[in-house]
Amino acid sequence: MLRWFTAGESHGMELVAILEGLPAGIPVSLEHIGNELSRRRLGFGRSARQKFEKDLVTLSAGVLHGSTLGSPVAIRITNSEWGKWEKIMTPEVPCKSDMSDAKRAQGLYKPRPGHADLVGMQKYGFQNSRLVLERASARETAARVACGAVAKAFLQQLDIFILSHVKQIGSIKIDYEQGAYPRFCDLEAIDSSPVRCFDKNTSEKMKDELHRIKRCGDTLGGVFEVLAYGLPPGLGSYVHWDRRLDAMLSAAIMSIQAVKAVEIGDGLAISALPGSEAHDQIVLESGLLTRMSNHSGGVEGGVTTGSALRISGSMKPISTVPRALKTVDISTRQPANADHQRSDICAVPAAAVVGESMVALTISCAILDKFGGDSLCEIKRNFSGYLNSIPKNLMSVIER
């Protein structure tokens, strides 16, 4: 069983992540984790914060000489801006002199619509929304991406590869034929796009739209898609509701800040089709079972089919709008404009990378549930043995 936790505040000393349940023998490097964290910073429309904040990563437990030990893995991401925030975000009771003049020490009493500010203040009885936003911030996803980097390293040992791309920003969307999805070999080209869009023409239109929305003092949301190749048939279960892989994946994507909807495969579009067109018909190809299409997104009945996994997340526009929205000053009970914190115009490209990590962690859980072992060698043996045990007349094509 794989469990993982994160801790830390947006402007705190560091983010901390713990991964428990990984087998021994997974190759892990700081370079790989650092590369994944740098991908999270990609995308036109990110805030100035991405330019001067650095993700300084430390593996403090569970990895020795580039390989996991089977014990909990501990990852620390130090805040490079901690010096500016140390007096304000100290866990100790601060001196009055440290808090008197600093602009950062001022309370935030104007909760931002669309954020967790007001509900967090109500839930915990806080009078200052900083006590909410520091943890609710999407900065926490850096720790998720670090965990996801380790999960990806594990999955790649089983020839399972995960990527993402942006399908839509605002009203601008990519239009491609069924089956013409990006492959893992396309990841470098996707990452080189300023909006991480697979199609060059659509990418330029998205960039133009972001320029326009920035001039208007507004923000945009959109849709990203995560794909996983190399998944064997049989991950997940139809036996219990909480073991259905599509349910677990949906929860994982929905947990990403600002995601408001999740679709697997063709998602909502399937509801408009007749049954004769909506389902993936099964045929024989070179002696193996395969499907003529992938409307289902690689999951049927909560179980993987062997086709590519496709899951999309729809992200609402960034809630911190430069053209401040109406709110109420909690300290005076008077109408006010919402506090404006430094933020992105659009974070869909970054959310896509976070989505990769959430999918990688969820699939890793399913892999360990089915093929669990104490070492990577043992899991590889179990994985191979399972594939070899499937009766020949039932074996499906595994899409890679």
UniProtKB/Swiss-Prot annotation:
Q: Where does NADP(+) bind?
A: 40, 46
Q: What class of enzyme is it?
A: lyase
**Catalytic activity, as annotated:** 5-O-(1-carboxyvinyl)-3-phosphoshikimate = chorismate + phosphate
Key words of the record: Amino-acid biosynthesis, Aromatic amino acid biosynthesis, FAD, Flavoprotein, FMN, Lyase, NADP
Q: List the disulfide bonds.
A: none
Residues involved in FMN binding: 135-137, 257-258, 301, 316-320, 342
Q: Pfam families recorded for this chain?
A: Chorismate_synt (PF01264)
Q: Which GO terms describe its cellular component?
A: cytosol
Question: EC number(s) in its UniProt entry?
Answer: 4.2.3.5
Q: Which cofactor does it need?
A: FMNH2
What are the BP-aspect GO terms?
Answer: amino acid biosynthetic process; aromatic amino acid family biosynthetic process; chorismate biosynthetic process
Recorded GO molecular functions are: chorismate synthase activity; FMN binding
Name the InterPro entries on file.
Answer: Chorismate_synth, Chorismate_synth_AroC_sf, Chorismate_synthase_CS
Give the cofactor note text.
Answer: Reduced FMN (FMNH(2)).
UniProt pathway annotation: Metabolic intermediate biosynthesis; chorismate biosynthesis; chorismate from D-erythrose 4-phosphate and phosphoenolpyruvate: step 7/7
Q: Which PANTHER family match?
A: CHORISMATE SYNTHASE (PTHR21085:SF0)
Q: Which HAMAP family match?
A: Chorismate_synth (MF_00300)
NCBIfam families from the entry? aroC, PRK05382.1
Q: Which family does it belong to?
A: Belongs to the chorismate synthase family.
- Subunit structure of this entry? Homotetramer.
Describe the function of this protein.
Answer: This reaction introduces a second double bond into the aromatic ring system.
User: What is the protein name for this chain?
Assistant: Chorismate synthase
Q: Which organism is it from?
A: Tropheryma whipplei (strain Twist) (Whipple's bacillus)
**Gene name of the encoded protein:** aroC
